[in-house]
């Protein structure tokens, strides 16, 4: 009998020891702080698809642009059928938050599909499509969207790299630099650099490009070319770091056609090595200076890894309570990210999609 009672404290002690040891090995997830989770029900105040689903089910976010530390833009497609079963089409929409993701307002756009953002400090170029393509200029200060062009879907009209005032523009025959503040002012790209990738910079008509392995600037207004920087090393490409609106970099590439042996070295314009890209880190990485975020491990148990020293040391955040099923992310410097989280709570009002804001904790 005494032995029978002795086993209970022993069993209890073993359980406590086990749970304590487990907690010691449970990853600590205080390296990110989720500061906002926006529910589209707050905007629409109704369920959709005949009352069966949260309003977020009708919104497909295809692009995220973060303008500054508090202004977030979501480019999306709104399924109008969800609100009215007789309207069988989608509408391109822009959602704007000025309080770091706590609330949003909707700006309807022409077209059925949201295609792209091109972000600068003062303006964004937005493209949507449907029966036609629509080009918008979004003012980051007034938060107003102005349609500046409507064209056919044959892609003969093309808007490209943008420095906040001047933008690369093609009509299918010739390539120009357009002054977005006065769109009647267009400067044709010179034949001497016609086949060289060029990028507007400085908001004064300057184009920067790599020629004969050196960097040059040509001003489309003065029509003068000057040597910008004589490079010490040889480079294969002069391109934006990741997306079209990211910083320009010098790139050296090895084994470009071999996925296993592929290697890409990224340098800034001072020829300082930033990082190396290979098969292991080629996709779903965001970079800002020495900061890297790996958001490739998505799904029902997503993980977000980030590093503040070019990937030498990593922190891993194990996302709890919601899933991340799409790779649509937006980042603000090395401070926070925005993405869509899915909460599975059955018929509870807590179920459905939310626009999440996660702050990185250094």
Indicate residue ranges for each PLM-predicted region:
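C-terminal motif of bacterial Sec signal peptides marking the signal peptidase cleavage site
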Residues: 20-21
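A short helix->beta-strand "capping" segment at the edge of beta-propeller domains
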Residues: 27-58
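Beta-strand-rich domains and repeat architectures in extracellular enzymes and scaffolds
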Residues: 52-84, 89
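Repeated scaffold domains used in trafficking and secretory/extracellular systems
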Residues: 58-65, 111-121, 153-164, 192-204, ...
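Short glycine/acidic-enriched loop and turn motifs that connect beta-strands
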Residues: 78-84, 129-132, 254-258, 298-300, ...
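A short loop-to-beta-strand structural motif that recurs across blades of beta-propeller domains
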Residues: 92-96, 134-136, 174-176, 214-216, ...
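Conserved Ser/Thr-centered positions that define the repeating blades of beta-propeller domains
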Residues: 97-98, 161, 307-308, 358
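Blade-level signature of beta-propeller repeat domains, shared across WD40, Kelch, NHL, RCC1
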Residues: 326-362
């Amino acid at each position: 009998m005494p032995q029978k009672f002795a086993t209970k404290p022993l069993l209890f002690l073993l359980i406590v020891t086990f749970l304590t040891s487990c907690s010691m090995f449970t990853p600590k997830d205080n390296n990110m702080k989720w500061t906002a989770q926006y529910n589209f029900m707050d905007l629409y105040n109704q369920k959709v698809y005949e009352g069966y689903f949260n309003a977020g089910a009708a919104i497909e976010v295809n692009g995220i642009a973060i303008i500054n530390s508090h202004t977030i833009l979501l480019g999306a497609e709104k399924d109008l059928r969800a609100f009215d079963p007789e309207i069988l089409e989608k509408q391109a929409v822009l959602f704007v938050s000025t309080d770091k993701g706590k609330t949003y307002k909707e700006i309807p756009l022409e077209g059925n599909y949201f295609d792209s953002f091109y972000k600068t400090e003062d303006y964004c170029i937005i493209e949507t499509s449907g029966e036609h393509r629509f080009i918008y200029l979004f003012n980051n200060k007034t938060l107003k969207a102005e349609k500046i062009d409507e064209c056919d879907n044959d892609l003969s009209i093309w808007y490209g790299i943008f420095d906040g005032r001047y933008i690369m523009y093609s009509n299918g025959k010739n390539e120009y630099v357009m002054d977005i503040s006065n769109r009647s002012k267009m400067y044709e790209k010179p034949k001497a650099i016609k086949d060289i990738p060029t990028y507007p910079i400085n908001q004064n008509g300057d184009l920067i490009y790599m020629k004969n392995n050196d960097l040059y600037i040509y001003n489309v207004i003065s029509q003068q070319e000057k040597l910008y920087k004589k490079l010490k090393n040889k480079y294969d490409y002069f391109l934006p770091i990741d997306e079209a609106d990211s910083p320009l970099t010098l790139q050296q590439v090895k084994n470009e056609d071999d996925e296993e042996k592929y290697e890409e070295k990224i340098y800034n314009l001072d020829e300082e090595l930033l990082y190396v890209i290979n098969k292991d880190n080629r996709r779903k990485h965001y970079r800002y200076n020495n900061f890297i975020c790996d958001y490739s491990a998505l799904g029902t148990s997503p993980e977000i890894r980030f590093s503040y020293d070019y990937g030498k040391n990593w922190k891993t955040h194990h996302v709890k309570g919601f899933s991340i099923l799409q790779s649509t992310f937006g980042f603000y410097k090395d401070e926070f990210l925005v993405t869509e989280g899915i909460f599975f709570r059955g018929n509870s009002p807590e179920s459905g999609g939310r626009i999440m804001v996660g702050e990185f904790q250094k």
